[in-house]
Swiss-Prot record:
<dbReference type="Pfam" id="PF00346">
    <property type="entry name" value="Complex1_49kDa"/>
</dbReference>
<keyword id="KW-0520">NAD</keyword>
<keyword id="KW-0997">Cell inner membrane</keyword>
<dbReference type="InterPro" id="IPR001135">
    <property type="entry name" value="NADH_Q_OxRdtase_suD"/>
</dbReference>
<dbReference type="GO" id="GO:0051287">
    <property type="term" value="F:NAD binding"/>
</dbReference>
<dbReference type="InterPro" id="IPR022885">
    <property type="entry name" value="NDH1_su_D/H"/>
</dbReference>
<dbReference type="GO" id="GO:0048038">
    <property type="term" value="F:quinone binding"/>
</dbReference>
<keyword id="KW-0830">Ubiquinone</keyword>
<comment type="subunit">
    <text>NDH-1 is composed of 14 different subunits. Subunits NuoB, C, D, E, F, and G constitute the peripheral sector of the complex.</text>
</comment>
<keyword id="KW-1278">Translocase</keyword>
<comment type="similarity">
    <text>Belongs to the complex I 49 kDa subunit family.</text>
</comment>
<dbReference type="InterPro" id="IPR029014">
    <property type="entry name" value="NiFe-Hase_large"/>
</dbReference>
<dbReference type="GO" id="GO:0050136">
    <property type="term" value="F:NADH:ubiquinone reductase (non-electrogenic) activity"/>
</dbReference>
<keyword id="KW-0813">Transport</keyword>
<dbReference type="InterPro" id="IPR014029">
    <property type="entry name" value="NADH_UbQ_OxRdtase_49kDa_CS"/>
</dbReference>
<comment type="function">
    <text>NDH-1 shuttles electrons from NADH, via FMN and iron-sulfur (Fe-S) centers, to quinones in the respiratory chain. The immediate electron acceptor for the enzyme in this species is believed to be ubiquinone. Couples the redox reaction to proton translocation (for every two electrons transferred, four hydrogen ions are translocated across the cytoplasmic membrane), and thus conserves the redox energy in a proton gradient.</text>
</comment>
<protein>
    <recommendedName>
        <fullName>NADH-quinone oxidoreductase subunit D</fullName>
        <ecNumber>7.1.1.-</ecNumber>
    </recommendedName>
</protein>
Length: 391
């Protein structure tokens, strides 16, 4: 007796809400079982790397907010570190603490969205509503410090744009005190929930070897049991002064990756607490006039200061010739910036390494043999944002 069954081809996205952006996924299905998953990218390509080649180093910063628009400050951080490496400039300690503080707030901002939307994709509505309430508070901190809720444009080569407004540290401290009980509530809904575990446990398993071979990083790598975190292995700013653990999983499945992200938020809370306690006084920008604009008070008194300000924001500053690569531990994984300077005021090349690009490549082998519904779970646990994948 011959088997006359044939596979069907199914197009998922790019308009489907569960694809988390403009992912077009071509699935080869044998009934409900996935044989192959072919992701098509590029629908959000905006030529960011090429655009940066025609902007000064200051004008390039806002482009990084628009890559992974869920965790903008972490990407600004990588670019600022790369420019500082070429300039060999000292960053004031207060600015370093502020950067680390907001990088960890950004990590919470990212993970709350991921866990909430992952729960919604699987059918649980409550976690998304609860977590969005907490995200709103963090976005208010963004707005108070930078004037914008999402595209902050706050980090600068040599420091940050402005000092923290009065009362902000106290409000962040209050938020951090009330946030852990909210996380406990989410855990009580999900951790031992029978339906949640049935949808996540043993789904999308990634072994340690596969995670390394595919170039995974962040929670995708740590979920497979590899304790690799750039904040520990290659610390930047004041991360070497912070005490925190690196959560890892055991089985490398969707449940482990969910749990790693949940535990990372508790570690971020520890780091934020330490930043608030240790926050020094002092300047938030380097005192190099080539990099730092004059104050508004000076501009009202001095024509030279006004000219200096105008030149800084139009012509920018020359960066010494050379090349560098700097990476940060962004919420989704290793976000890196390769900069090549020819000694002028615009970069000759700015290559961006986004973690989601490598993670999406692994979707095919992670999905094979699973049900169609499991593909949605795997996409959610990849934590992909197409701003950074398509660039």
């Amino acid at each position: 007796m011959t088997n006359n069954t044939k596979t069907i081809t199914l197009n998922l996205g790019p308009q489907h809400p569960a694809t988390h952006g403009v992912l077009r996924l071509i699935l080869e299905m044998d009934g409900e079982i996935v044989n192959n998953a072919d992701p098509h990218i590029g629908l959000l390509h905006r030529g960011t790397e090429k655009l940066i080649e025609h902007k000064t180093y200051l004008q390039a910063i806002p482009y990084f907010d628009r890559l992974d628009y869920v965790s903008p400050m972490c990407q600004e951080h990588a670019f600022a570190l790369a420019v500082e490496s070429l300039l060999e400039c000292e960053v004031p300690r207060r600015a370093q603490f502020i950067r680390v503080l907001f990088s960890e707030l950004t990590r919470i901002l990212n993970h709350t969205l991921n866990i909430g939307s992952q729960a919604l994709d699987i059918g649980a509505t409550t976690p998304l509503l609860w977590l969005f309430e907490e995200r709103e508070k963090i976005m208010e901190f963004y707005e108070r410090v930078s004037g914008s809720r999402m595209h902050s444009n706050y980090f600068r080569p040599g420091g940050v744009a402005e000092d923290l407004p009065d009362g902000l540290l106290e409000d962040i401290d209050k938020f951090i005190d009330q946030f852990p009980p909210k996380l406990h509530d989410i855990e009580s809904l999900l951790n031992e929930n029978r339906l949640w575990k049935q949808r996540l446990v043993d789904i999308g398993v990634v072994s340690q070897k596969e995670a390394m071979d595919w170039g995974f990083s962040g929670p995708m790598l740590r979920g497979s049991g590899i304790a690799w975190d750039l904040r520990k292995s290659n610390p930047y700013d004041v991360y070497d002064e912070m005490e925190f653990e690196v959560p890892i999983g055991k089985n490398g499945d969707c449940y482990d990756r969910y749990f790693v992200r949940m535990l990372e938020m508790y570690e971020s809370i520890k780091i934020i607490k330490q930043c608030i306690e240790k926050m020094p006084k002092g300047a938030v920008k380097t005192n190099d006039p080539k990099l730092t604009p004059p104050t508004r008070a000076k501009m009202k008194e001095s024509m030279e200061a006004m000219i200096h300000h105008f030149k800084l924001y139009t012509a920018g500053y020359d960066v010494p010739a050379g090349e560098t690569y700097k990476a940060v531990e962004a919420p989704k994984g290793e976000f890196g910036v390769y900069l090549y300077s020819q000694g002028v005021n615009i970069p000759y090349r700015c290559r961006i390494k986004s973690p989601g690009f490598a993670h999406l490549q692994g979707l095919d082998f992670m999905s094979k043999g699973h049900l169609m519904a499991d593909v949605i779970t795997i996409i959610a646990t990849l934590d992909i944002v197409f701003g950074e994948i398509d660039r």
